[in-house]
């Protein structure tokens, strides 16, 4: 019983530490000195939405909503990726962008 409780506590602590890294990465991306490419931003957006919401749960915007459609497609490409894996990918991509563009 004690081991199971300890394991749950460790997993919970691990999740919160990981969530803190994710939140920090999201804040750092907002401070980039140079704007990343549209492709980089779309990929980052897709990972962010997958990490925070999960699989896409909205209809694709109409043809005339180009920005909305691009964001929908970026998120839809991440469909099926676990929230944890999406969070890891977001953190990794954000670190790469901070190294590339500076904050």
Curated annotation (Swiss-Prot):
One example of a Gene Ontology biological process annotation: fatty acid metabolic process
Keywords on record: Endoplasmic reticulum, Golgi apparatus, Lipid-binding, Transport
Keyword flag DNA-binding: no
Domain ACB as annotated: residue spans: 18-103
Lineage: superkingdom: Eukaryota
InterPro entries listed in its UniProt record: Acyl-CoA-binding_prot_CS, Acyl-CoA-binding_protein, Acyl-CoA-binding_sf, FERM/acyl-CoA-bd_prot_sf
Keyword Transport: yes
Residues where an acyl-CoA binds: 30, 45-49, 67, 71, 90
Localization: Endoplasmic reticulum; Golgi apparatus
Pfam families with a match to the protein in the record: ACBP
CDD domains: ACBP
Molecular function terms, GO-annotated: fatty-acyl-CoA binding
GO CC, any one term: endoplasmic reticulum
Annotated family: Belongs to the ACBP family.
Function: Binds medium- and long-chain acyl-CoA esters with very high affinity and may function as an intracellular carrier of acyl-CoA esters. It is also able to displace diazepam from the benzodiazepine (BZD) recognition site located on the GABA type A receptor. It is therefore possible that this protein also acts as a neuropeptide to modulate the action of the GABA receptor.
PANTHER family: ACYL-COA-BINDING DOMAIN-CONTAINING PROTEIN 7, ACYL-COA-BINDING PROTEIN, ACBP
Complex and partners: Monomer.
UniProt protein name: Acyl-CoA-binding protein
Naturally occurring in which organism (per UniProt): Anas platyrhynchos (Mallard)
């Amino acid at each position: 019983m004690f081991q199971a409780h300890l394991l749950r506590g460790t997993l919970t602590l691990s999740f919160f530490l990981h969530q803190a890294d994710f939140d920090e990465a999201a804040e750092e991306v907002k401070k980039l000195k140079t704007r990343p490419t549209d492709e980089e931003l779309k990929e980052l957006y897709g990972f962010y939405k997958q990490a925070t919401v999960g699989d896409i749960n909205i209809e694709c915007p109409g043809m005339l909503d180009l920005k909305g459609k691009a964001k929908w497609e970026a998120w839809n490409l991440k469909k099926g990726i676990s929230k944890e894996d999406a969070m890891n990918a977001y953190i990794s991509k954000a670190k790469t962008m901070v190294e590339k563009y500076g904050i």
